[in-house]
Amino acid sequence: MIKLSIEEKMFPDRVIISDFNISIQKNEFVVITGASGAGKSTLLNIIGLIDTSYHGRYILDGVDVSGIDYKRQLYLRGSYFGYIFQDSLINEKQTILRNLLSVIELKKQKEYHCVILNELEKTGLHGISPETSAALLSGGEKQRVALARALLRKPKILLADEPTASLDNDNKIKIMDILLDYHSHGGTVIMVTHDTNLITNDMRIISF
């Protein structure tokens, strides 16, 4: 599914990744661990086509996506990937519903209402009205809204960058249960984390 070879990825002051190769198969749960500043999040951004400023080659589902134009990059990003980050990136000035609809084309938003309710139920938010202001949610609830948003378009690959870092144990378990459920239904997960307690035997570990 993914074959990525990074010859060099530069930051203004240093090389952050060099001579790195990775292959990821469909329906793998891959965990990327390592010290802070080692380039884990940068790698995730490269995989997710957020960052294309590196020297190397990237094959996604048999297609070379190295150096693709911006329009094609956006299309593949939306077609393949869902994202969840340590910061939920939820707009607190909007309702839960509006946050979720923000990733859906305007002309398709009406047909997604039932899908949204289903995703909220999957993420344990069915007891909260979709019209609730995001500002009223706890940190764990915001992260579950972010995860529901990431899963809304049925991504083939879910990228999770420290998704439980700022959460209490109960919410960590809830987030991991959702990721594991997505994986059990055929999804591919690539997760960056410092928390080794989240790792199970069926996950593949890549140390940076």
Feature roles, as predicted:
Residues 87, 94-106:
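Q-loop/switch helix immediately C-terminal to the Walker
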